[in-house]
Amino acid sequence: MAENQQRVLIASHRGRFSGNIVENTLPAFETAIRSGADIVETDIHLTRDNVMILFHDPTPLRLLGLPGKVSDYTLEELRACRLKNVIGEPSDWHINTLEEFLRAMKGRVMINLDQCWGFMDQVYDLVEKMGMEDQALIKGRAPYDEAVTWAKNRHWKPKFIPIIAGDKEIPLFEALPKEMDIPIVEVFLTGDEDKLISPDFVAGLKHRGIKLWVNSLSLGSGIDLSAHHDDDVSVTDAPEKGWGWLIDHGVEVIQTDWPSELRRYLDRIGK
């Protein structure tokens, strides 16, 4: 990430998916890269035959029309179905494995691997096998005990992104061992005066060389991660009210569903 230290980074949520391009597929990640993403985020599940696949939901109903859980099916059974596109019609795409994803992304962008703590050793054994330790980012929620214990048992230091969901969790973040590799901190914002976006907190992160990550995702009514400075207001009203506000308050990584629009805005303002 050294070459990107001076600019705002774009994290593309599940790749760039729209129309017939389905979330968490190689076409979605290729599209995200072409749209200007610096980081691509994906979710991982295990199949019944212990294959790591790219999939967000615990159930395959929404994208594959299958009942039960993802873990009820083998990779072959899941790949027998075509993924549904954004209007619920079968697309031309099928589920991808984590290994396929890593091969496609190697040497190109940072990768944020999500929803995989239950089989983290398996994930990072593959990351290590493919020589992608410097590209991989893993998030964790407070109190972070699992991440600390796991990191101590590795012979290389995983890049860990602590998630701080409220100012009461700041002491837990500050208590993390200094030897942990923490390039980024993700925060959930509840309002414009949130302590997690205060000048003092942001300055403290900068002093440690840690970037501040906020999700500008608009995930549905009642779900707010950015104090309403989100994708919706940025693309339907004015980016200055959404992405611009976050940047003005020290945010250096924005996770979005609109990477190309955010890239154009960043280019326009020189960020």
Predicted features, each with a name:
Residues 1-271:
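Phosphate-group recognition and catalysis centered on beta-loop-alpha active-site segments
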